[in-house]
Amino acid sequence: MRRVIRSSRYERAAARLLRPSVQQELEESIAAEPERHPLIPGTGGLRKARWRRPGGGKSGGVRVIYYFMLRPDVVFRADLYAKNEKENPTHAERNQLQKIASEIQREFGG
């Protein structure tokens, strides 16, 4: 069974941006195919999933930043934001995400 870990930042954003049923659907989709979404260059292996929210319109989707480790089969949800807030992480945010990826690798041995 795949283990899912959520950062406090992710949980706060999910509570603000997603209904519980949409959050569950999103998380199940990523857990089922974690390697499906593109890697974000310069982040040490984090990925970005795009997800459409019901009734959100063209700019109403969200982006999930996550890290997947095959062994020990962990998906770590690092961040979530609305598309209308930003399209991609800034250079500074990518540097921070790279640090997060390194910490996850140290913690879980990936």
Where are these regions (language model features)?
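Enriched for short, Lys/Arg-rich terminal
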Residues: 68-110
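Sequence/structural signature of beta-propeller domains
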Residues: 9, 25, 32, 45, ...
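Arg/Lys-rich, positively charged N-terminal/basic patches that mediate binding to nucleic acids
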Residues: 1-22, 106
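Basic/aromatic recognition patch in beta-strand/loop cores that engages polyanionic ligands
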Residues: 36-80, 85
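Amphipathic alpha-helical interface surfaces
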Residues: 6, 22, 26, 58-61, ...
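Alpha-helix C-capping/helix-to-loop hinge sites
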Residues: 13, 17, 33, 84-87
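Compact soluble domain cores
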Residues: 18-38
